[in-house]
């Protein structure tokens, strides 16, 4: 006869899973964050800054995974259970009402520079720059050279002779190099809460999706809107945003057509009469004076009088423009001397 032995689960673990499940169910946005490399003082500072916007709880990875799966089952939400695939390192549960993109931005803004530790993987290329270290001659000169940093004594101080990448992104930083970088005051990493994944409304977001260049995104949206507007306007597509401009364009075109074809309407009668009068006066100006009556002569005279000041103004404008060009040319010539 087979005897089944029921595994004993510590009561505190059961309570912890229950607490984590309550946290997961309490907010629409659930994130898994990594806080392994965050020193205790900085972690406390971050907690204090974001306390009003998020709820954060550290726990064992196995308990977080169990809580996610049980909560997903109870909520009949299999997508939520997929968050368990992202639990690693020093994971913690974070819940909030903020959307994933705002959450990512909040956590990034609350990161602070820190020295790299020996054994850590470089998150980026780490470079030392040419120049004085401000340190007097001594054993540190040998330490710099031992990790491949070209250094010498210049003006009584240890100086780095050239810019150099001492470790590339993805490489492990040796303890010796980490100590040298720390003495140089180089803090190449930012420590804080790193998002591993965020769940909202049936979608899981990863950091590569959440990392958005806001200025570029806004410029792209504005360009897309302008292009869509132009396309709709030029194809006469009656979108809500374009319709007032299409109506205005149609009115202007219809009015111009009406005037051109002498089709009289309430709106165009005045323009058609003005055009006809202008054409009549233009024709009359070609005739000899004896063929014209006094009324036509008076009208022609008034046209000539009103045209004269306009011509004078045009000449004056051309003269000013010419003088401005000469000034600009002179200024450009002087600029070449300097």
From Swiss-Prot:
Its BP terms in the Gene Ontology are: cytoplasmic translation
- MF (Gene Ontology): large ribosomal subunit rRNA binding; structural constituent of ribosome
Q: Does the keyword RNA-binding belong to this entry?
A: yes
Compositional bias (Basic and acidic residues): 317-328
The record ties this protein, via CDD domains, to: Ribosomal_P0_L10e (cd05795)
Asked if the Swiss-Prot or TrEMBL record annotates the protein with the keyword Secreted, the reply is: no
What Gene3D superfamilies does the entry give?
Answer: 3.30.70.1730, 3.90.105.20, 6.10.140.760
Q: How does it assemble?
A: Part of the 50S ribosomal subunit. Forms part of the ribosomal stalk which helps the ribosome interact with GTP-bound translation factors. Forms a heptameric L10(L12)2(L12)2(L12)2 complex, where L10 forms an elongated spine to which the L12 dimers bind in a sequential fashion.
Q: Which HAMAP family match?
A: Ribosomal_uL10_arch
Functional summary from the UniProt entry: Forms part of the ribosomal stalk, playing a central role in the interaction of the ribosome with GTP-bound translation factors.
**Which named protein is this?**
Large ribosomal subunit protein uL10
């Amino acid at each position: 006869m087979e005897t089944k032995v029921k595994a004993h689960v510590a009561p505190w673990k059961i309570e912890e899973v229950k607490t984590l499940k309550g946290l997961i169910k309490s907010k629409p946005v659930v994130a898994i964050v990594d806080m392994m490399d965050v020193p205790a003082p900085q972690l406390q500072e971050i907690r204090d800054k974001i306390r009003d916007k998020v709820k954060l709880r550290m726990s064992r990875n196995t308990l977080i995974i169990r809580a996610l799966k049980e909560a997903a089952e109870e909520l009949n939400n299999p997508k939520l259970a997929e968050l368990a695939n992202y639990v690693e390192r020093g994971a913690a549960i974070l819940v909030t009402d903020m959307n994933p993109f705002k959450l990512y931005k909040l956590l990034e803004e609350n990161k602070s520079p820190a020295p790299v530790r020996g054994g850590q993987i470089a998150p980026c290329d780490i470079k030392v720059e040419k120049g004085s270290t401000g340190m007097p001659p001594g054993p540190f000169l040998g330490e710099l050279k031992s990790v491949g940093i070209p250094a010498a004594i210049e003006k009584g101080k240890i100086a780095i002779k050239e810019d150099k990448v001492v470790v590339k992104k993805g490489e492990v930083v040796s303890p010796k190099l980490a100590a040298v970088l720390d003495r140089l005051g180089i803090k190449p990493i930012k420590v804080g809460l790193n998002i591993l994944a965020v769940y909202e409304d049936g979608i899981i977001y990863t950091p590569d999706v959440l990392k958005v260049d806001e200025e570029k995104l806004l410029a792209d949206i504005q360009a897309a809107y302008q292009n869509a507007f132009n396309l709709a306007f030029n194809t006469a597509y009656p979108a809500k945003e374009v319709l007032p401009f299409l109506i205005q364009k149609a009115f202007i075109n219809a009015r111009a057509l009406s005037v051109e074809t002498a089709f009289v309407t309430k709106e165009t009668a005045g323009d058609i009469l003005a055009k006809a009068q202008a054409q009549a006066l233009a024709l009359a100006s070609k005739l000899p004076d004896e063929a014209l009556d006094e009324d036509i002569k008076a009208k022609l005279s008034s046209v000539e009088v009103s045209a004269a000041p306009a011509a004078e103004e045009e000449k004056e404008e051309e003269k000013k423009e010419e003088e401005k060009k000469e000034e600009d040319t002179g200024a450009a010539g002087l600029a070449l001397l300097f």
